[in-house]
C-alpha cells in the first residue's frame, strides 16, 4: 500500500533533523601548505576514510611559529588559495581560514577552541574533534601550548607510514593511527625543485599547479 501523501517528506525532514542534532566527527588538518602537494591530498583522503569523518578542515596556518623564524613563508592569502583549490577536489574536505583571520602565531589549542565555539554559536552539538598530526610530532606533544587542555578536547589522529615505528604519546592523549601515503614528497622539496626551474609533475595536484601559475607563485609558468 503506498505511503500517505506527505509521509515520505515527513520522514526525510525527520532524518535531516536527527542528522542536525548528531554530534559530527570533525578533523582538523593544519599545515603551512607552502605549497600543498599530493602527499597532503592522499593523507586527507585516508583520514576521511579511516576515521569516517563528517568533514575535514584543511586549516591554513597564519604564522607557523615552528617555521617562520627559519625561512620566508609564502603570504597566507596565497597559501589559502592553493589549499582552497586542493579542498575542492576532495569530497568531505573544506578549506578554513580561521587561523588567518585570527592573526598572530598559530597554536592548536586556540584553533580547537574556536571550532568548538563556532559549533556552539550555530546551535550544533559539540563535535568530536580529531586533530591531525604527523608521527614525528608525537614525542613533542607535551611541549605544546596548553597541552593538557588540548589532550582533553581532542582525539589525536596520527598519520604515519605503515612501515615506520609508532612512537608512544605522552600520558592522557587519546590516539588513533592512520596509515599515511607512501609518497616521498615535501613542500620544501617542491620549492627547491621549482627554484631550479625543474618540473614538479606528479608532486603537486593539477588544481594547485593551476592556482600557483595564476598567482605567479614559486616562478611557476615563467
Model-inferred region functions:
Residues 1-222:
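Nucleotidyltransferase catalytic core that binds NTPs
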Amino acid at each position: 500500500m503506498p505511503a500517505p501523501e506527505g509521509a515520505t517528506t515527513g520522514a526525510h525532514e525527520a532524518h535531516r533533523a536527527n542528522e542536525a542534532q548528531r554530534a559530527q566527527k570533525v578533523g582538523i588538518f593544519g599545515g603551512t601548505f607552502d605549497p600543498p602537494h599530493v602527499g597532503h591530498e592522499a593523507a586527507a583522503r585516508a583520514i576521511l576514510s579511516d576515521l569516517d569523518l563528517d568533514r575535514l578542515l584543511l586549516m591554513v596556518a597564519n604564522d607557523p611559529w615552528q617555521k617562520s623564524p627559519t625561512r620566508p613563508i609564502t603570504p597566507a592569502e596565497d597559501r589559502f588559495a592553493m589549499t582552497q583549490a586542493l579542498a575542492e577536489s576532495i569530497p568531505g574536505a573544506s578549506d578554513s581560514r580561521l587561523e588567518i583571520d585570527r592573526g598572530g602565531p598559530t597554536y592548536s589549542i586556540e584553533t580547537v577552541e574556536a571550532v568548538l565555539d563556532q559549533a556552539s554559536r550555530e546551535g550544533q552539538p559539540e563535535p568530536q574533534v580529531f586533530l591531525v598530526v604527523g608521527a614525528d610530532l608525537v614525542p613533542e606533544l607535551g611541549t605544546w601550548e596548553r597541552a593538557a587542555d588540548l589532550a582533553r578536547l581532542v582525539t589525536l589522529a596520527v598519520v604515519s607510514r605503515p612501515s615506520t615505528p609508532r612512537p608512544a604519546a605522552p600520558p592522557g592523549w587519546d590516539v588513533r593511527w592512520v596509515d599515511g601515503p607512501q609518497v616521498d614528497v615535501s613542500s620544501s622539496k617542491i620549492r627547491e625543485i621549482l627554484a631550479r626551474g625543474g618540473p614538479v609533475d606528479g608532486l603537486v595536484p593539477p588544481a594547485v599547479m593551476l592556482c600557483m601559475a595564476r598567482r605567479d607563485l614559486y616562478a611557476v609558468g615563467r
